[in-house]
A protein has these predicted regions:
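Glycine-rich anion/phosphate-binding loop at the beta-strand->alpha-helix junction
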Residues: 264-308
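Metallocofactor- and cofactor-centric catalytic cores in central/energy metabolism, strongly enriched
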Residues: 3-167, 171-175, 180-270
């Protein structure tokens, strides 16, 4: 199985415009349309969704927008202040949305229309950030969050990577095989902080792994896996005699992942490769670790749970 897709979070950002009722709603809506046009022209239509609901100082609008982006399959949120914005309902949206949220705002396009075209979104961002803190809502605010449609499109695109990391962490299980080697305190994982990030961890002993490896002796899938490795290594296959054991180990880890992922979508492995690994397993696991990483399964060694 190729884990490059299944083990990598797909991000879909719901873009929700907001408006304060003493400003024209059309100002926010038109600026949202300009933002989406700028985004799709530069980055395409993937990863973003334009919510048709503009929140106008209304908790009911907030609920409507929330339901709409959920229905559209969004797992990340961009609150776009087209004008000053309603600090209560816009921050409630971020509070009730189950996923990463970003707040950005529209700069004034011109000095020529200060009656109908003035939005004061910069000031609105100040109020929004203050209200987010009051509610203990964590949201991403770029260093310069107020910009033109093109600048905000770039911010939206940059948010994809941030959102992907947060979405991934919230549905990640780290499978570890330890304990850590002697004198490597840096590899000692503070489990509490992993839980604080929303990460699950399954800690196993090296002996558990060794038992599972032994149970894969004579696995009928080993010859096919060896051929796969031979084709990949080509002229670099200087130790053909060790390939069956490496194939057995790779199958052990892949089977372990599927048997132990539980309810989590994404999996990473923190393994151990010394000092007893080489003498007991009969090989070093670096090649298998790199193959798994190439498949889309991150693997660290030395039980480096928190560092990878």
């Amino acid at each position: 199985e190729d884990y490059k897709m299944s083990n990598l979070p797909e991000v879909k950002i719901g873009v929700v415009a907001v408006s304060r009722d003493c400003f024209p709603e059309s100002l926010s809506v038109n600026r949202r349309k300009a933002l989406m046009k700028a985004y799709t022209e530069k980055y395409g239509t993937d990863s973003v969704y334009e919510c048709p609901v503009c929140i106008v100082e209304s908790e009911i609008h907030m609920v409507q927008a929330l339901e709409d982006i959920k229905k559209a399959g969004c797992n990340a949120l961009c609150v776009y202040l087209g004008n000053f914005g309603p600090e209560i309902s816009e921050t409630l949206l971020a509070k009730h949305f189950d996923g990463p949220a970003m707040f950005i705002a529209a700069a004034e396009e011109t000095q020529n229309d200060l009656l109908g075209g003035r939005g004061d979104a910069y000031c609105g961002m100040l109020n929004a950030s203050y209200n987010l803190k009051l509610r203990n809502v964590k949201a991403y605010i770029p260093e310069n969050p107020v910009g033109t449609a093109a600048e905000c499109a770039d911010m939206l695109h940059e948010f994809i990577s941030i959102a992907r990391a947060i979405v991934g962490l919230s549905d990640l299980k780290i499978i570890s095989f330890g304990p850590r080697p002697l004198n490597f305190l840096a590899c000692n994982a503070p489990i509490k902080q992993l839980y604080n990030l929303g990460v699950e961890i399954e800690e196993n002993s090296e002996l558990d792994l060794f038992e599972a490896f032994k149970k894969h002796d004579g696995d009928e899938r080993i010859p096919a896996k060896v051929k796969e490795m031979e084709a990949e290594l080509g002229a670099g296959n200087h130790k053909p005699e060790v390939l069956p054991k490496l194939a057995q180990y790779e199958l052990t880890l892949l089977d372990w992942i599927e048997a132990h992922r539980g309810y989590r979508k994404y999996v990473a492995i923190a393994g151990k490769c010394w000092p007893a690994f080489q003498t007991q397993f009969g090989f070093v696991p670096c090649y298998v670790n790199s193959r798994l990483t190439g498949m889309g399964i991150p693997v660290s060694c030395e039980v480096d749970i928190y560092g990878w």
